[in-house]
């Protein structure tokens, strides 16, 4: 049967102590509610209804690219009242999957199983057994059938001993749901309209109510404060790490690895501790990544090595290249095979040719370096005059001496040499030597200044 989805995301989230809506706080660098939306898309829902109540502008800015029905809950009168706001978008002849917006680790296969259970029942609930159910709604059963969900504050002492709890997620027929919602009342300790009361209504009508459970309790754990946010983040990251290891990636410590985007991997990759992956990163085979590296929207080819404490952003690293330690490749940095960038080298909009190297203490911006060139320590390409950026071209086999400044626009020819300490402002032809520095003068008999006694 066709189904639509209602995501409850109207809570104030006061315990987060944040000006940002709770459901926009990130898990793996993505808003938690976006993760739920992405999961729902895998199931083929006919429509997604988002019930919101606070900071609408922030929510729409973050989630506006999704095809959503926006359902405003102006007053926070309970979960039943929240679902009522989506009623105009619910059809009688479809099932309705109700989800909570603060449980981002829910899996598509768990929701698929829940929908399958609904095919053989009138109502399907997602429940879970926990060691400490304090504060949670208890599942009341008669045999295999669920007869009610009792909120903790309304539960008797005997009911509070039950460890099977409500997750807030369920599937109901649209026509039945609308009828039950219309009959809700707020005669309870909280003075709210409980969505859970529809379960008792269904039971009183003799409806068949079945339950499904997730593979892991973490799938349905909600987030109400920063401590829980951090715990869910770590659980998510460890889950990603386990998946990568099953794909053949060696993680020296899977508890100290962060994937905040997507990664495409080859074989025999070794990743040290505290590596962060952001955006979309593609890593070839036989790649080694040292500790404390940040890789964002990069491509790293087979056999490359990224040494410790290096940062790569929108960079392309060719086969058997070496980067770092302490290197920074900014957007537009391209290294061809067997090139090397060493410690404290920064590249931006720069191509480093096959076998070329800049081993230390260098800035290369808006630069093209040919094949087999050597860039000495302390070399700077002066690419910005305060208004415009200009290019530097360094030819094949060129040798740039240490502590040189190449003032763009400038071109260094093939096999040309620049003497150490030079400030080069004009073209250096192929195989020429350029020396652009003050002539050394030695003063004999010179006396150092001394401090007065």
UniProtKB/Swiss-Prot annotation:
Region entry N-acetyltransferase, spans: 248-453
The protein's required cofactors: Mg(2+)
Comment on bound cofactor: Binds 1 Mg(2+) ion per subunit.
Start and end residues of each stretch annotated as Pyrophosphorylase: 1-226
CDD domains: GT2_GlmU_N_bac (cd02540), LbH_GlmU_C (cd03353)
MF terms in GO: glucosamine-1-phosphate N-acetyltransferase activity; magnesium ion binding; UDP-N-acetylglucosamine diphosphorylase activity
Pathway terms, separated by semicolons: Nucleotide-sugar biosynthesis; UDP-N-acetyl-alpha-D-glucosamine biosynthesis; N-acetyl-alpha-D-glucosamine 1-phosphate from alpha-D-glucosamine 6-phosphate (route II): step 2/2; Nucleotide-sugar biosynthesis; UDP-N-acetyl-alpha-D-glucosamine biosynthesis; UDP-N-acetyl-alpha-D-glucosamine from N-acetyl-alpha-D-glucosamine 1-phosphate: step 1/1; Bacterial outer membrane biogenesis; LPS lipid A biosynthesis
Disulfide bonds: none
Residues at which Mg(2+) binds: 102, 224
Subcellular location: Cytoplasm
Major place of residence: cytoplasm
Region (Linker): 227-247
Binding site for UDP-N-acetyl-alpha-D-glucosamine: 8-11, 22, 73, 78-79, 137, 151, 166, 224, 330, 348, 363, 374
Keyword Heme: no
UniProt-annotated catalytic positions: 360
Domain of life according to the entry: Bacteria
Protein family (similarity comment): In the N-terminal section; belongs to the N-acetylglucosamine-1-phosphate uridyltransferase family.
Oligomer and partners: Homotrimer.
Biological role stated in the UniProt entry: Catalyzes the last two sequential reactions in the de novo biosynthetic pathway for UDP-N-acetylglucosamine (UDP-GlcNAc). The C-terminal domain catalyzes the transfer of acetyl group from acetyl coenzyme A to glucosamine-1-phosphate (GlcN-1-P) to produce N-acetylglucosamine-1-phosphate (GlcNAc-1-P), which is converted into UDP-GlcNAc by the transfer of uridine 5-monophosphate (from uridine 5-triphosphate), a reaction catalyzed by the N-terminal domain.
Alphabetical list of PANTHER family matching this protein: BIFUNCTIONAL PROTEIN GLMU, NUCLEOTIDYL TRANSFERASE
Protein name: Bifunctional protein GlmU
Organism, scientific name: Pseudoalteromonas atlantica (strain T6c / ATCC BAA-1087)
